[in-house]
């Protein structure tokens, strides 16, 4: 069994990418379980055709404790037999959402949820690299990390930060970076930029997912593209990504870069302009003058 985690900046399309890729993986005959590690509990909605799966934390609150739960209450089977679990989190502003991740994974292990599987995937809130959300990395639950990014500055900044988190636990926990997934935003020279970022991080761009409106059309129906329009070229992109992950033997210890290096890379590719130190702190009317 391989345990992999998808990390990435909020709003990058991480959950959508993960669900479509795992749908393709299940279509290939792999036995898959998705564990949502995001308080939004939206990591399984396209597989289950639901708004949000009832989370382990919600069910535990209703029952009194996690120990009172039955596995079939928290684990729901969706399309292609994909097993789905949402860890959930507390009400906004109260408590630590990362605790929900820790509680859920511990419960699933003790309840025998990991038996007879080929892949377990963790869909993790990515720009908050706190202890709870880093738990799949920190305790060696996820051995392979895939970072969903794009050619936008903040997505790349988050990817570099996540690489730092992987590096921190690479020697103690054995976690490795499996690659960057570029979920295209149609920015200039995007594929070249992410290939170069991957090179500097000592990894690969494992796949470039082109932008396609069919993804949004499928999401409106709470479906993966694999199910909604299986003959669409975008469905084949996710199938290619699933095959690449299934066959991936490039798992590395990342080499995160400094903020200065990241900015230099963005300037080199024309994403950022070279700063003119003389204009820093100047108001609009002063610059015009």
UniProtKB/Swiss-Prot annotation:
One of its GO terms (biological process) is nitrogen fixation. One of its GO terms (molecular function) is ATP binding. It catalyses: N2 + 8 reduced [2Fe-2S]-[ferredoxin] + 16 ATP + 16 H2O = H2 + 8 oxidized [2Fe-2S]-[ferredoxin] + 2 NH4(+) + 16 ADP + 16 phosphate + 6 H(+). The reversible ADP-ribosylation of Arg-99 inactivates the nitrogenase reductase and regulates nitrogenase activity. It holds the Pfam family Fer4_NifH. Homodimer. The modification ADP-ribosylarginine is found at residue 99. PANTHER family: LIGHT-INDEPENDENT PROTOCHLOROPHYLLIDE REDUCTASE IRON-SULFUR ATP-BINDING PROTEIN. The key enzymatic reactions in nitrogen fixation are catalyzed by the nitrogenase complex, which has 2 components: the iron protein and the molybdenum-iron protein. Its cofactor is [4Fe-4S] cluster. Gene3D superfamilies: P-loop containing nucleotide triphosphate hydrolases. InterPro entries: NifH/chlL_CS, NifH/frxC, Nitrogenase_Fe_NifH, P-loop_NTPase. It comes from Parafrankia sp. (strain EAN1pec). [4Fe-4S] cluster binds at residues 96, 130. ATP binds at residues 8-15. Binds 1 [4Fe-4S] cluster per dimer. Belongs to the NifH/BchL/ChlL family. This is Nitrogenase iron protein. It is an enzyme of class 1 (oxidoreductase). Its EC number is 1.18.6.1. Keywords: 4Fe-4S, ADP-ribosylation, ATP-binding, Iron, Iron-sulfur, Metal-binding, Nitrogen fixation, Nucleotide-binding, Oxidoreductase.
């Amino acid at each position: 069994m391989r345990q992999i985690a998808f990390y990435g900046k909020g709003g990058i399309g991480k959950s959508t990418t993960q669900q479509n890729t795992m749908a393709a993986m299940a279509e290939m005959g792999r036995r898959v379980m998705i564990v949502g590690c995001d308080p939004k509990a939206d990591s399984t909605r396209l597989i289950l055709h639901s708004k949000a799966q009832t989370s382990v934390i919600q069910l535990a609150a209703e029952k009194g404790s996690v120990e009172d739960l039955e596995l079939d209450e928290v684990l729901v089977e969706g399309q292609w037999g994909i097993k789905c679990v949402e860890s959930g989190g507390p009400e906004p502003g109260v408590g630590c959402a990362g605790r929900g991740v820790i509680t859920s994974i511990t419960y699933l292990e003790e309840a025998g949820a990991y038996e007879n599987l080929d892949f377990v995937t963790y869909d993790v809130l990515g720009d908050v690299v706190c202890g709870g959300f880093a738990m799949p990395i920190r305790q060696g639950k996820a051995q392979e990390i895939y970072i969903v990014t794009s050619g936008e500055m903040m997505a790349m900044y988050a990817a570099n930060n996540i690489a730092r988190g992987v590096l921190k636990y690479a020697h103690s926990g054995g976690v490795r970076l499996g690659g960057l997934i570029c979920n295209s935003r149609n920015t200039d020279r995007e594929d070249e930029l992410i290939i170069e970022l991957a090179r500097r991080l000592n990894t690969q761009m494992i796949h470039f997912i082109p932008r396609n409106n069919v993804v949004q059309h499928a999401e409106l129906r709470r479906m993966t593209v694999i199910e909604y329009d299986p003959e669409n070229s975008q469905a084949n992109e996710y199938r290619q990504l699933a095959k690449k992950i299934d066959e991936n033997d490039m798992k590395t210890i990342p080499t995160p870069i400094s903020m200065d290096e990241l900015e230099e890379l963005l300037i080199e590719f024309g994403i950022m302009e070279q700063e003119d130190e003389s204009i820093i702190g100047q108001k609009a009317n002063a610059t015009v003058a």
